[in-house]
């Protein structure tokens, strides 16, 4: 923390904050250990007015407009405050973008296609004009590219937030990159999301004991699951469930042997999954068990498995920006609470039929 500076923290997010010192203001992007990964200034005047000099400042292209995105999640965090996505100039992995507004802009050639990992279209990135290029730090396609040294690259760490509301609140950081009026709209939208989330969380459970839920997937013969500080674990707690790995405080995913997981079968009431299954008509519990020889070993004794199929549910997009709807959906699945209404979106989480 810089002495004499004024810090403004978001309400729920932990990976960014604003700092003001003298006449300079900036956005600081933070790692989990509070290391500053990037210091972002809206223009050169803000940089020059900051009495606290920083190494490698990111100065937005003040004479350009709009944002370029590396992740489809970034687009979904723009849409709540920019319903027509007029500030979206280009992006990667466009085949995975799901929103109607986004696909319309793509169809009208209003958005440049940057390709996707590993075949990034550097020519399209170079041709694009934008205020900032929003990336996730572990997949920067411009790493080591000399002509991109002065490009305003901003790491977006929504995926590393330990709460659903923290993830969604990154819509404010993206809006700040555009303008004060965009930030005002993002604040208004997010306040509504947060109020609905808190209301859903405050509802009592329709049963005396909460369900114990495990989530994760089989990777290279091990079970890989979110830790207890992850947004998934927090979502389950807010839905009234108990996360089966609540004692795991380590950073990153928790890896368990399948033998250890098998021993837990009797302690787990339900298994929660995120899948990508194109054959949606035949997505059943039996089909999931058949898809991997290990799945039969880890099936809870109850036989209950619920899943979000990323083919039909925009799990990494719309639902990130609308955690209130995700919470209502999950509470409805686990406890039959309410009607699980999610606006014009189909429910994301569903029990797998036998």
Segments the model singles out, each with a brief description of its role:
Residues 72-73, 83, 93, 138-139, ...:
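Solvent-exposed coil/turn segments that connect beta secondary-structure elements
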Residues 26-34, 38-139:
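A short, structured surface patch at a secondary-structure boundary
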Residues 61-66, 123, 127-222, 246-247, ...:
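Extracytoplasmic substrate-binding proteins
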Residues 1-63, 339-354:
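N-terminal hydrophobic or amphipathic helices and topogenic motifs
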Residues 251-342, 351-353:
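C-terminal soluble interaction/assembly domains
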Residues 199-286:
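Flexible, glycine-rich surface segments
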Residues 84, 149-152, 239-240, 301:
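Short, structured coil segments at secondary-structure junctions
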């Amino acid at each position: 923390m810089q002495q004499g500076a004024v810090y403004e923290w978001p309400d729920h997010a932990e990976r960014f904050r604003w700092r003001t010192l003298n006449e300079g203001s900036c956005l600081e992007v933070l790692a989990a250990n509070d290391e500053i990964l990037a210091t972002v200034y809206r223009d050169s005047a803000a940089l020059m007015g900051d009495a606290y000099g920083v190494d490698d400042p990111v100065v937005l292209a003040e004479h350009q407009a709009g944002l370029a995105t590396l992740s489809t999640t970034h687009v979904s965090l723009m849409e709540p405050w920019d319903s027509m996505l007029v500030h979206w100039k280009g992006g990667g992995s466009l085949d995975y973008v799901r929103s109607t507004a986004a696909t319309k802009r793509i169809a009208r050639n209003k958005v440049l296609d940057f390709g996707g990992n590993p075949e990034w279209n550097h020519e399209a990135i170079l041709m694009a004009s934008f205020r900032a290029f929003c990336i996730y730090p572990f997949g920067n396609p411009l790493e080591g590219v000399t002509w991109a040294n002065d490009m305003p690259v901003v790491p977006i760490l929504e995926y590393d937030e330990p709460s659903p509301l923290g993830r969604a609140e990154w819509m404010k950081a993206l809006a700040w990159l555009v303008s004060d009026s965009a930030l005002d709209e993002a604040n208004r939208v997010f306040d509504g999301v947060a109020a609905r989330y808190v209301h859903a969380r405050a509802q009592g459970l329709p049963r005396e004991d909460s369900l114990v839920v495990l989530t994760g997937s089989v990777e290279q013969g091990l079970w890989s699951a979110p830790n207890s500080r992850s947004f998934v674990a927090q979502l389950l707690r807010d839905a009234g469930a108990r996360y089966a790995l609540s004692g795991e405080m380590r950073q990153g995913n928790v890896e368990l042997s399948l033998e250890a997981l098998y021993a837990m079968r009797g302690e787990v009431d339900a298994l929660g999954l995120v899948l990508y299954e194109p054959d949606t008509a035949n997505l059943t519990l039996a089909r999931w068990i058949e898809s991997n020889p290990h799945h039969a070993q880890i099936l809870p004794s109850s036989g209950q498995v619920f899943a979000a199929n990323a083919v039909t549910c925009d799990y990494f997009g719309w639902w990130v920006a609308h955690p209130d709807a995700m919470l209502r959906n999950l509470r409805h699945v686990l406890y039959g609470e309410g009607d699980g209404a999610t606006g014009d979106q189909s429910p994301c989480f569903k029990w797998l039929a036998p």
